[in-house]
Design a protein with these regions (language model features):
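A cross-family "folded-core" feature that marks the main globular domain of proteins
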Residues: 1-185
Length: 185
């Protein structure tokens, strides 16, 4: 409780009160799993670090505190899980951060493959901006808040002048339609 209150004050975050229970419950579960020899690997850890950098740093601080207080050795994977608790509590539970991370990861995979195994420079400003756009796109997609733009003329110009990018977007569109059964316009 003290840590969450400290984060609220230090970071100026408005957190839903549900974080007190969900985070405490997660910490106790993680310690219990560790005592039973079970370690969960956070498959989205890299995405969490990139998409929710501030929350991940908070998760690392909490991880250090938990390890010291309870004299355990929880892994950095837990810091990623802790970060998601803060992300979800920040938005009052509206955001499904796990699903957003998956969608962003799927789109990044398509972009990397489409452009011949292109590797992103994670510390690049353009990459960070791209991630931010993908994150907000995924959030709007999940809440079906995508808006149709009636300006077909602009669409035609973009489609003709940026054919390669349009091809990549088409692949993303097809994946989203197939995977999530929701057609975007």
């Amino acid at each position: 409780e003290a840590f969450v209150n400290e984060v609220k004050e230090k970071e100026g975050m408005k957190l839903n009160d549900s974080i007190y229970f969900s985070l405490s419950d997660h910490i106790m579960g993680a310690i219990s799993r560790l005592e039973n020899g079970i370690r969960l690997q956070n498959m989205l850890l890299l995405d969490i670090k990139q998409l929710y950098h501030k929350e991940y740093e908070i998760g690392l601080e909490l991880l250090k505190k938990v390890n010291e207080t309870f004299e355990v050795d929880l892994s950095a994977d837990e810091a990623g899980f802790f970060a998601l608790h803060f992300v979800n509590a920040e938005d009052g539970g509206k955001t499904d951060s796990y699903q957003i991370s998956i969608i962003v990861h799927q789109i990044l995979d398509i972009v990397e493959k489409y452009y011949d195994n292109m590797e992103f420079q994670e510390d690049n400003l353009y990459y960070q901006r791209f991630l931010t756009h993908l994150k907000y796109f995924a959030q709007r997609f999940l809440h079906k808040e995508l808006h149709y733009d009636e300006n077909q003329e602009l669409f035609k110009i973009i489609k003709e002048q940026y054919r390669e990018a349009y091809g990549c977007v088409k692949m993303i569109y097809l994946m989203m339609e197939e995977e999530y059964k929701y057609a975007m316009t």
